[in-house]
Amino acid sequence: NMACDAGYDLVIPYTNVNLTDVKGLVQDAIFSRSIKDAKRTGIFICGKDASLALDMMDLAKKSMVPPFEISVFPDPAGSFTTAAAMVACTEKTLKEKFKTDLKNKNVVIYGGKGIVGGISAIMCAKYGSKCTIVGYDGIENVSKKADEYKNRFEVNISPADG
């Protein structure tokens, strides 16, 4: 629906796509059009799993053969754009009201195991915040998520059980 609202001429949804499908879909999109038209083609990766969406993006980029390249944008469940908006609003408020930013701030994100909270924590940690994500189903589960973020995004995020 966002692509339609943005004025795209054609939107073709694919459902139940997995990693093994990505290369074929990307190459079908790039090789079935001229180079000029391929540049006007984009793949929007949705779903509900941020790690899988990023894996799909990485594979999509590796599947391209220059100069046949297209845009690829992952935003599973709208989480990346929602997290970016949340962090941007927080930064704006800190700047306007307190003349500061997120660097070296202690940031606690409740629901941090969820997709939006997790991406927000990653963004804040990348900016230099000291982040804690709070989960509600035991310290083991939230610790696994914090470790996943550390391994994939090279950020230090502390787990806490709420």
Placement of each model-derived feature along the sequence:
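General beta-strand structural signal in soluble alpha/beta enzymes
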Residues: I45, S71-P76, P159
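Extended hydrophobic secondary-structure segments that form protein cores and membrane-embedded regions
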Residues: I43, D75-P76, N106-G111
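Glycine-rich phosphate/diphosphate-binding loop of Rossmann-like nucleotide-binding domains
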Residues: K92-G162
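Short, surface-exposed connector motifs at secondary-structure boundaries
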Residues: D37-R40, E69, A125-T132
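Gly/Ser/Thr-rich loops at beta-strand to alpha-helix junctions
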Residues: K48-A53, G78-T82, G112-G117, G138-E140
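A glycine-rich, Thr/Ser-enriched phosphate-binding loop motif common to dinucleotide/cofactor-binding enzymes
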Residues: P74-K92
